[in-house]
Amino acid sequence: MWTVVLGLATLFVAYYIHWINKWRDSKFNGVLPPGTMGLPLIGETIQLSRPSDSLDVHPFIQKKVERYGPIFKTCLAGRPVVVSADAEFNNYIMLQEGRAVEMWYLDTLSKFFGLDTEWLKALGLIHKYIRSITLNHFGAEALRERFLPFIEASSMEALHSWSTQPSVEVKNASALMVFRTSVNKMFGEDAKKLSGNIPGKFTKLLGGFLSLPLNFPGTTYHKCLKDMKEIQKKLREVVDDRLANVGPDVEDFLGQALKDKESEKFISEEFIIQLLFSISFASFESISTTLTLILKLLDEHPEVVKELEAEHEAIRKARADPDGPITWEEYKSMTFTLQVINETLRLGSVTPALLRKTVKDLQVKGYIIPEGWTIMLVTASRHRDPKVYKDPHIFNPWRWKDLDSITIQKNFMPFGGGLRHCAGAEYSKVYLCTFLHILCTKYRWTKLGGGTIARAHILSFEDGLHVKFTPKE
């Protein structure tokens, strides 16, 4: 036992010395942004991981901005990081992508999503491919031509099931709903083989991405790796079964990836599993969180519910068959619904920051950011700018009527920006609009409890959101 303890102590001391020397031996000339690096190894990770009960920018970032200004340095999960809440700086960094900076995830998340393998050696080529295959199956054309009816059917089935229950915890229930829709699109009939609480495991992974990469029993990182391996095992079984019994000719997401494997050198079976893992996660987590926040905010603002219901009833009554399916033209006409979604995304900022990494020393605004440092662009701060949004802390969907497209483009970034605008943005909006149309025309809902915000590096709900759904007469 003492041998183990002494060994761990030696390891810690060695890492501490390495960490200190790393800063002392930095070979660059220039001025770093102001700030503090915190403790060895953990930096200031604990402060950012501490939940806040507000939708506002996290208190850790607010306090740092008040003390050091909108650009400051820190250390998160063992990585040196420059954090920026400066709009001009953030725009400049996004324009530098492919030149001075590249897309980046902190080491923990990179491990979870397989980005410490061959992916990073061909990041530009891989991103182009992932964007292409995602748009092919989840983009506007696919939604308009094929996918919208499946989203509508999934929403109707879920709401009918929820209406038979005395109470529904919306975050978990909606995560399962969206996950099933997404994997059915990705795997077709093989989606039935993905049993178990995979959405729950994915949510745990997201919650643990700021954890220190210490892989031994009891650590958050170890638990997340275990969940990751269990999910990947199920995905590998689906891929192997498809190859053994069907082949690559099925026209779903998996089928296209297997077919592309024959012509693209960087695509291997392991790459496909990591791709399926990443897209499965990305396709549901943000939608379910946004949907939960929408219902929380609607419960607090009945005047918004009234106008929302009026818009959807008008769409329904204008049909030849009021109970007929939603059309693409109807979706595009849901103006106020999209304003509600935009306002929720502005306040909620489900993903409140973007991460990049410098590939060379970068000089900007009088500072130097050394090669290899992470840059955290706090896009959520722009969503609270009173110069752009009057009374920015108030939920007001009507504000979007007066905002022009250029102002929105520069100051509203819920789906990323620059070269990395989310390929699934339209899918998210279509899903939310479709769900709200069915909800507003066929159901009433009552909040029973929960809804407490827990904002850390992600948005979550401390006690869920418990709702009773009742069919309209």
Swiss-Prot record:
Signal peptide: none annotated. Its EC number is 1.14.14.71, 1.14.14.-. C.sativus and L.esculentum expressing S.grosvenorii genes SgSQE1, SgCS, SgEPH2, SgP450, SgUGT269-1 and SgUGT289-3 accumulate siamenoside I and mogrosides III and V, thus providing a strategy for vegetable flavor improvement or for heterologous biosynthesis of mogrosides. It is a single-pass membrane protein. Heme binds at C422. Pfam families: p450. One of its GO terms (biological process) is sterol metabolic process. The chain crosses the membrane at residues 4-24. Highly expressed in young fruits 15 days after anthesis (15-DAA). Also observed in roots. Pathway: Secondary metabolite biosynthesis; terpenoid biosynthesis. One of its GO terms (cellular component) is membrane. It catalyses: cucurbitadienol + 2 reduced [NADPH--hemoprotein reductase] + 2 O2 = 11-oxocucurbitadienol + 2 oxidized [NADPH--hemoprotein reductase] + 3 H2O + 2 H(+); cucurbitadienol + reduced [NADPH--hemoprotein reductase] + O2 = 11-hydroxycucurbitadienol + oxidized [NADPH--hemoprotein reductase] + H2O + H(+); 11-hydroxycucurbitadienol + reduced [NADPH--hemoprotein reductase] + O2 = 11-oxocucurbitadienol + oxidized [NADPH--hemoprotein reductase] + 2 H2O + H(+); (24R)-24,25-dihydroxycucurbitadienol + reduced [NADPH--hemoprotein reductase] + O2 = mogrol + oxidized [NADPH--hemoprotein reductase] + H2O + H(+). Keywords: Heme, Iron, Membrane, Metal-binding, Monooxygenase, Oxidoreductase, Transmembrane, Transmembrane helix. It comes from the Eukaryota. Its cofactor is heme. InterPro entries: Cyt_P450 (IPR001128), Cyt_P450_CS (IPR017972), Cyt_P450_E_grp-I (IPR002401), Cyt_P450_sf (IPR036396). GO terms for molecular function: heme binding; iron ion binding; oxidoreductase activity, acting on paired donors, with incorporation or reduction of molecular oxygen, reduced flavin or flavoprotein as one donor, and incorporation of one atom of oxygen. Mogrosides, the major active constituents of S.grosvenorii fruits, are a mixture of cucurbitane-type triterpenoid glycosides that have been proven to be powerful and zero-caloric sweeteners and can hence be used as a sucrose substitute for diabetic and obese patients. Hydroxylase involved in the biosynthesis of cucurbitacin and mogroside tetracyclic triterpene natural products (e.g. siamenoside I and mogrosides IV, V and VI). Cucurbitacins have cytotoxic properties and exhibit deterrent taste as a defense barrier against herbivores. Mogrosides are nonsugar highly oxygenated compounds used as high-intensity zero-calorie sweeteners; they also possess pharmacological properties such as regulating immunity, lowering blood sugar and lipid levels, protecting the liver, and acting as antioxidants and antitumor agents. Belongs to the cytochrome P450 family. This is Cucurbitadienol 11-hydroxylase. It comes from Siraitia grosvenorii. The gene is CYP87D18.
